[in-house]
């Protein structure tokens, strides 16, 4: 399975976009990874997520939790491939929680699943909920690790690929200076 080229599959799925994007951080970029485009193609998603499943073979865990929205399908497919239960966390009145009859038991060893990790904010919110319920987060699994060098999560990251996408403050964005309109992708509210 190690011969899978994740970047090529992201491009084939139209998940790796070029243009002018306003990110949820408020920064601008000329590239954006929209993993939802990959996840609409089950066979391609299966291949990419198999790269993560392979990396998790030596990790001791018994449940996977994906934050809604991006982590839900990843959690399901990763659970299917690793033969572990997969559940999701979601926001209720703006607060991340585990509900719908799902539970984390004391002592559960948890992998948090995501589509893209950029700042780690959603993962860390889910980690807090898991730890409050008595679970232990043993890692974060994601399709794309987009973190900058200075972004730390306190947990090991198991990704299908690492993407370095440059971002810019609005005042330093060459695309803004050229009056190229931006697109607001993603699901999180912009700052």
Swiss-Prot record:
Pathway named in the protein's UniProt entry:
Pyrimidine metabolism; UMP biosynthesis via de novo pathway; UMP from orotate: step 1/2
Which residues does orotate bind? 118, 146
Q: Which cofactor does it need?
A: Mg(2+)
The record's keywords, sorted A to Z, are: Glycosyltransferase, Magnesium, Pyrimidine biosynthesis, Transferase
Q: What class of enzyme is it?
A: transferase
One biological process term from GO is: pyrimidine nucleobase biosynthetic process
- UniProt xrefs under Gene3D superfamilies: 3.40.50.2020
GO MF term list: magnesium ion binding; orotate phosphoribosyltransferase activity
Q: Which reaction does it catalyse?
A: orotidine 5'-phosphate + diphosphate = orotate + 5-phospho-alpha-D-ribose 1-diphosphate
Judging by the UniProt lineage, the source's domain of life is: Bacteria
- Disulfide bond sites: none
The record, for HAMAP family, names: PyrE
NCBIfam families per the UniProt record, alphabetical: pyrE_Therm
- State the function annotated in the UniProt record: Catalyzes the transfer of a ribosyl phosphate group from 5-phosphoribose 1-diphosphate to orotate, leading to the formation of orotidine monophosphate (OMP).
Quaternary structure? Homodimer.
Query: How is this protein named in the record?
Result: Orotate phosphoribosyltransferase
Q: Whose protein is this, by species?
A: Clostridium botulinum (strain Loch Maree / Type A3)
